[in-house]
Amino acid sequence: MKKFLLLFMGIVSLSISCSKDDDIVGPEGPGGESVSVQDFMWKAMNIWYFWQQDQADLADDRFSTNEEYNAFLTSEADPADFFDNKLRYTEDRFSFYSDDYKSLTDNLSGISRSNGVEFGLFLYGDNDTDIFGYVRYIVANSDASTKDISRGELFTGVDGQSLNESNYRDLLFGENATYTLNMADIADGEITPNDKSVELTKQDGLVENPVFIVNSYDINGQKIGYLMYNGFTNEFDEDLNDAFGQLKSDGVTDLVLDLRYNPGGSVNSSRLLSSMVFSSNTNNVYIRQRWNDKLLEVFTDEDLTDYFADKTGAGTAINTLSLNRVYVLTTGSSASASELVINGLNPYVEVIKIGTTTRGKNEFSLTMVDDPNRDGAPFIYTPSRENQINPENSWAIQPLVGRNENSVGFSDYTAGFDPDIELKEDLENLGVLGDENEPLLAKAIEEITGISGKRDFTVKTPVELFTSSKMFTPMKDNMVLDKPLHLNLDLK
């Protein structure tokens, strides 16, 4: 039986007729308890999951009767446990779920509940169980942007309670709308609480523009561009293109691309960014996708291939710098779509990485909700169909559905990309982002100009990240596929 697949702007459309596993339905367990969430999870993962062929419990012929299927669905009462223990493949590090699909999809668009402080967390103390935070940057137009708090400041407590591994989640990421940070100083590696406190309030619907800083520097006759980009959010692709238009107008010949705090996001935004750096020649292959075995049986090479872009999604001509070299600032918080830019550019451009090793996330995902009747697209989230999602099930899953490889077939960077020039951030000298004296940027400028000067890049107290605030947003470090793709699919 023929089925038709349409993937457009992150929405996969699959026309489904009845098949063996379509005939199995299991909305209730033997005792009448609802297992609709588990039912949705299994059916969605059976179609789309990258490791479907490797996970025995997701096999097309796993169940011979409804009773057997229902017994499986009720084997874990908690949907989270069901996903983790029954469906997730052992090699899968990044698939996740949410009990609130609206929060998840808002976050993909750059909308979150936040007070605007983006921070990293650090373990310290005799047993490495105490925690302190350091401010990375402040989101514009947030509550924090109106308060006396800035990059480089440290905090050790919340509402008078010292942070540790047991309480930091509740204190920093709990339901409390308002909290007070108890600040601290650092000198010679020693952290000392001070008398400063900052009250902060989380805002619902805070929108973060990821195009954070755009600068040009004229140093010894060389025009150097700098862009700090903090998330691949396709709603801001035009802003990104405008930033490159500014850099192009300024006549920059070298670019420092700061992705140190960028956890990823839209695959298409990564394609546009790479085109702005290198080329808008649509004959050049950017990346290719690999899906699960049963989907790959019907995909053509053209279906799986993405090329560099000459226009944004809105039809605006790409502002490209046509560079043959780019300097990328990285840390362990540089993940997914950030790494995709590095990998996609590598065959064409000399990518000089400065900082520390990236996260190592090379798979892409799709957002799935309990909408099995979407016209030709079972379970794939579609904004216009929110009223068709099962009102009794607000869960969403974000499973990995494929892996990207560059134009020469390389995709093996699960250990991350090591820097060409290692330089850790220094808690005692984080510097001002965008300032040419900020250590990572200064190092890049030194490499570009070839003038070493007398700058001392010794790191007194290196950042050894435990986790960061962005890892507690619904989208975390996710890479989301959003591309036009039209396929004929015949599922056995």
Predicted stretch roles:
Residues L14-S17:
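C-terminal motif of bacterial Sec signal peptides marking the signal peptidase cleavage site
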Residues G231, E235-D242, L247, V252-D254, ...:
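C-terminal "post-core" interaction segments
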Residues S19-D254, S269, V463-K492:
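Flexible, low-complexity junctional segments that flank or bridge functional domains
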Residues M1-F4:
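Positively charged n-region of N-terminal signal peptides that target proteins for export
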Residues L6-I11:
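Small-residue packing motifs within transmembrane alpha-helices
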Residues R260:
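Active-site beta-strand/loop signature of hydrolases that rely on acidic residues for catalysis
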